[in-house]
Structure formats: C-alpha cells, structure tokens
Amino acid sequence: IITSAVVLLMLLTSSVKVSAQTHKPDDILGTWLNQEATGKVQIYKEGDKYFGKLVWLRTPLDSITGLPRTDKENPDVKLKSSPLIGLVNLKNFTFDGKDQWSSGTIYDPKNGKTYKCYIEFESANKLKIRGYVGISLIGRNTFWTRSIN
C-alpha cells in the first residue's frame, strides 16, 4: 500500500506543467507566432505593464483593394481604417510574481471584440493565452510559439 502511494505521488508530481516553474517578469518579451500561423505579435513592456502589437501577417494586403489590411471589424468607426500591422491587441498585463501575466485584455481583430485575458507559459517557448468574458471558466485558449525572426 505504501509503495502504491509513493508511485502515485511520483506520477502526480512528475506531470506538473512547465508553467509551475517560476518565471521572470520579462520572460514573456519577444515575438510570438499565433496558433494559426497567420500573424506575429511582439510583446513589449511599458513601465510595469506588458503589451503586444501585430508586427507580421501572412496575408498583409486586402484581397480586394490590394492595400494593407485594416481593422474593419472594429466597432469604433474611427478605427476601422487603422492598419492591422502595428495594432496593439494585448493591453495592460501585469506579472503576478510567479507564473502568470494577468489583468489585461486581448483584442480580436477577426470579430472586433475585446476580452479579459491572462497569459502563462505552456512550455519554454509556448504561451497559453486565455481570453474570456466575465470569469475565466467561460472562454477559450489559444497557443502562441516563440518566433526567432
């Protein structure tokens, strides 16, 4: 019985994610490729807050106009003509002191909506981005991979 308990304890502790490791606040900085490989976001720091902006799109030009793609789904009419490249879509994240960047928002230019969000490492070069409405149980995850260029 003791052997079974020891084996179970070893299995449980060995399956802890990389995110259980303590990260430094600036570990998140850099350029990240989104899950669909259609865009890259550069995460940067201003003061003690973290932000992200679109720096690359697989399809940077509008298929109809041939001009740079714009934020056409934005609910603010004044922003619909803003270019997607350079758009700040991650705002006001703070590091919790251990493993999570939280209290921020993520803007989805595909639907023009902004969601509460937190970010944590899934593995050394992979972020888990959790966007949600209200409470984090009602939301979805997406995973971004660190980009080397």
Task: Please give the residue ranges for each predicted region.
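Bacterial Sec-dependent N-terminal signal peptides
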Residues: 1-22
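N-terminal helix-cap/turn-to-beta initiation motif at the start of protein domains
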Residues: 19-31
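Short beta-strand segments that buttress and anchor functional surface loops
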Residues: 31-34, 102-109, 129-131
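Central antiparallel beta-sheet cores of small beta-barrel/beta-sandwich binding domains
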Residues: 37-108, 114-116
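Generic beta-strand structural signal
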Residues: 45, 95, 121-122, 146
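Short polar/acidic secondary-structure junctions
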Residues: 109-111, 120, 133-136
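Short, compact, well-ordered microdomains
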Residues: 117-127
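Edge beta-strand at a domain terminus
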Residues: 124-126, 133-149
